[in-house]
């Protein structure tokens, strides 16, 4: 049985603050006279402010592979969005500056408040509610949602999962959480810190299913969760698009990043990165 699809317009209307999904970050100067000095000098030559002159500082939740994650062996941040961020930095002639991982649902408030990070990237869906708080760049990738269950599970359809006693894991603050709350109202929706916790919980039988971005769940099933699956009808066509989060107070930076993204698309860089991380263009 196929899952009910929502129109992109309807889906986006429901989504609250927080997304899918995970962005890179660079260390940021604290608020104060030295911070404002860096911002002023950055704006004088570029048309936008930076928390640290000459660097593009980013925050993200680094538990959302293949978009943003930390390499356990090297300790380096990596992923499709990390590579996109570094490519944008190169276009802007800025050095990357990545801050330690943060909770996903703190990203939008942090960028809105300012003073810590310039941008966030990490499979963050553009929604109307989020746009009330921060600005997004133009979209750089399309996405949908998905439901993941354990192979052999008796409950795999939306009707079966939308029942009392069913435990559905989601990452807190994401569009996956919004979709689950709207479409599985009879089930218990369990918000977690990251998608790895959600999928591991399904694997161990703690949860009946999880809902998350399709590119992420597909990647994780291939990499580490061979006993999980996206059941027939489990791909949910929500028509989402990812964008880079920027403060509303920094329109010049949004404009500069949009220009960089356009150049990365036209020169083939985006296609190359998609093939590197997804095996094909999306």
Could you describe each region identified by the protein language model?
Residues 32, 82-91, 174, 241-282:
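Extended ligand-binding regions for polar small-molecule ligands
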Residues 28-41:
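Bacterial lipoprotein signal-peptidase II cleavage site
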Residues 62, 142-149, 214, 218-261, ...:
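Periplasmic-binding protein-like
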Residues 58-60, 65, 77-90, 146-199, ...:
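Bilobed "Venus flytrap"/periplasmic-binding protein-like clamshell domains
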Residues 1-10, 15-26:
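N-terminal secretory signal peptides
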Residues 105, 124-132, 178-181, 203, ...:
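A ligand-binding cleft/hinge motif common to bilobed small-molecule-binding domains
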Residues 95-160:
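Acidic, polar ligand-binding/catalytic clefts
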Residues 44-122:
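Extracytoplasmic small-molecule ligand-binding "clamshell" domains
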């Amino acid at each position: 049985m196929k899952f009910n699809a929502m129109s992109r317009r309807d889906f986006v209307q429901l989504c609250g603050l927080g997304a899918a999904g995970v962005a890179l970050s660079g260390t940021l100067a604290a608020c104060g006279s030295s911070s404002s000095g860096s911002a002023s000098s950055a704006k004088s030559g570029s048309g936008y402010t930076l928390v640290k002159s000459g660097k593009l500082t980013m925050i993200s939740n680094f538990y959302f592979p293949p978009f943003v994650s930390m390499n356990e062996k090297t300790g380096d941040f990596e992923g499709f969005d990390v590579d996109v961020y570094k490519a944008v930095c190169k276009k802007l002639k800025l050095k990357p500056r990545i801050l330690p991982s943060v909770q996903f649902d703190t990203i939008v408030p942090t960028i809105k408040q300012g003073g810590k990070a310039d941008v966030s990237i990490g499979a963050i869906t553009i929604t109307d509610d989020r746009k009330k708080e921060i600005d997004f760049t133009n979209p750089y990738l399309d996405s949908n949602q998905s439901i993941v269950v354990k192979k052999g599970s008796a409950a795999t359809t939306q009707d079966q999962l939308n029942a009392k006693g069913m435990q559905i894991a989601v990452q807190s603050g994401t569009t996956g959480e919004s979709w689950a709350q709207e479409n599985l109202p009879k089930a218990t929706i369990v918000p977690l810190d990251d998608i790895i916790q959600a999928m591991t919980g399904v694997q161990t039988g703690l949860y009946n299913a999880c809902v998350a971005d399709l590119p992420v769940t597909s990647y994780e099933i291939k990499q580490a969760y061979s006993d999980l699956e996206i059941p027939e009808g489990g791909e949910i066509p929500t028509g989402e698009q990812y964008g880079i989060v920027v403060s509303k107070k920094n329109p010049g930076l949004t404009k500069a990043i949009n220009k960089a993204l356009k150049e990365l698309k036209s020169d083939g860089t985006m296609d190359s990165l998609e093939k590197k991380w997804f095996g094909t263009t999306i």
